[in-house]
Amino acid sequence: KSNSTRKKVNAALFIDGENISSKKAEQIQKIANKQGVLGTEKVYGLQKDECTKSWSDKAKKLDIKDIRLCGNPEKDKVDNKIKKDVNQEIKNNKSVDVVCIATSDKGYTDTVKELRRQGKKVVGIGEKKAPKELRDACSEFFEIK
């Protein structure tokens, strides 16, 4: 079957760069691409965080929008920005029915549950350390190595 006969699903990918290594970028993108047509691909990190700097190069290479947050590194600053952007995306782009979130952080569980209540398919992409609560909240969860 050719791809043109398959129904196109509009999907969005959000990556918590503080929580997942940039070495996993290709793997994450590959999984997300299988979920539908990605209209949005973003990775998040703090401007002054050495750990997430490697995401900037990777993002350029893979055409992922690199979101750098300035200011003091407050707890959950990146997480809160991602949650806000996910909600904006859903509100502004009605055709998005699949949301891919790359993280192993339990803090996204409520956001995932809320998206599911709104009828969205939520695909979690995370490492072995991802907690059961997050895995169970997602429509599907892919563990990456």
Predicted regions located by residue number:
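Class I SAM-dependent methyltransferase SAM-binding "motif I" and its flanking Rossmann-like core
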Residues: 134, 143-144
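Domain-level signal for Mg2+-assisted phosphodiester chemistry and nucleotide/NA-binding surfaces
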Residues: 1-91, 113-117, 121, 129, ...
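Receiver (REC) domain switch/active-site residues of two-component response regulators
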Residues: 139
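GT-A fold catalytic core of metal-dependent nucleotide-sugar glycosyltransferases
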Residues: 92-93, 106
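Short acidic loop-to-helix transition motifs that present clustered carboxylates
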Residues: 51, 106-107
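Acidic beta-strand-to-loop metal/phosphate-binding motif
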Residues: 44, 97-104, 111, 115, ...
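Residues that line or immediately flank small-molecule/substrate-binding pockets and catalytic motifs
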Residues: 17, 103, 145
